[in-house]
A protein has these predicted regions:
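STAS-typified acidic loop motif
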Residues: 15-30
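Charged catalytic carboxylate motif
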Residues: 27, 48, 117
């Protein structure tokens, strides 16, 4: 399996790639669901998968600099979802750290639960960010990658 700038090439089913803005989140959810079906995801897994994808994509377009790029492909029996934006997290390791057996974070503010939800649904969630912080975050990039079982 060959690699490219986005990671492993899909095995058999070509990747789907779309730019997402706040106004296009609904269309992105529909595309993700159709892609998951086309790539062989068990139908009962699709609703939760779309919830996780929506949470990460919504974060990208509301906290990063829109538009965000949503990419979906198949790799070794998993559905792989990558969301990239032009934002910068100071410490992306905090996104994937933590005890998933802990209760849902109870904050007295709206929001703040999307990453926790996505981490509990996905098989894996990784996040990384790049920026020349010595100069500015103008060239920053954040990538969140989720893997979901197809069956």
């Amino acid at each position: 399996m060959a690699n490219n700038e986005f990671g492993p090439e899909p095995d058999g089913n070509g990747p789907v790639s779309v730019m997402v803005t706040l106004g296009r989140l609904g269309a992105a959810r529909q595309l993700a669901a159709a892609t998951a079906r086309r790539m062989g995801m068990r139908p009962s897994l699709i609703p939760d998968t779309i919830i996780a994808i929506n949470e990460i994509t919504t974060n990208a377009v509301t906290h990063g600099r829109a538009p965000a790029r949503l990419r979906i492909w198949r790799d070794n029996g998993d559905l792989v979802v990558e969301v990239r934006d032009r934002g910068h997290w100071t410490n992306p390791a905090t996104v994937v750290a933590g005890d998933l057996s802990a209760d849902l974070p109870l904050k007295p503010v709206p929001g703040g639960r999307g990453l926790w939800i996505a981490r509990t649904i996905a098989r894996t969630l990784t996040a990384d960010t790049t920026a020349d912080t010595a100069m500015s975050t103008a060239n920053a990039s954040t990538r969140v990658t989720l893997r979901f079982a197809l069956t």
